[in-house]
Amino acid sequence: AGNQQILHGKTFSGKIEIRENAQEFNEMGMNQAMDHLMALHILQDILKENGLDYCRDRVYIYGQSHGAYLAYLCNRLAPDLFCGIIDNSAYLFPYYLEHDRQVTKIGEIFSLQKIYHYMMADQEIDREGYDLEYLYRGFDNHARIICYHGIDDEMIPLDEKSSFLDRVNGALLHTISNREVDGTTLKSTGHS
């Protein structure tokens, strides 16, 4: 009980070393998207080899945060593959290329905050190759995009996301306000 009293209500913070190197690191862009597309093509080959059919006109891609960002990249790289994107809080540029990632675990006795710094954030990059606004400019999008975005998203403000989607064919924005938060499916109006 003595240790619990010492720790009670405290927050501990520390930088976590991410084990990345030149051969294995989170590139956060096109390479990750190509990995996803390769996995999908392998799945398609397995289905074909086993005589299993699927409706090629009903392939959707879903993601949350960085996963939704990757969904947009996959759609841009393979514009006729997906009939739709379900986007939960995608940013338009990889957030962690400009910011450290902070993860907080709130426990009963104390909280632990971890800070991750990705190797890719220190590299010189062609920013346009990561920027969805640039990549979708003039792009003839065929996928229906259904986007869920909170009014208080701290990673990408709603007005920026709305402006982007206004310029993309087939995009529909569902704004998450306090009225939609139910604590189960929708837990906040922030980045979730």
Q: What is the role of each PLM region?
A:
Residues A1, Y95-L97, G183-T185:
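Short, charged, surface-exposed secondary-structure boundary motifs
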Residues G2-G51:
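Alpha/beta-hydrolase active-site loop
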Residues K10, E17, D35-M38, I61-G63, ...:
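Short linear motifs at secondary-structure transitions and domain/linker junctions
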Residues E24-N31, R58-Y62, H149-I156:
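Conserved aromatic-histidine-acidic binding/catalytic patches
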Residues H41-T104:
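Primarily recognizes the serine-hydrolase "nucleophile elbow" in alpha/beta-hydrolase
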Residues V168-S192:
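Catalytic histidine neighborhood in serine/cysteine hydrolases
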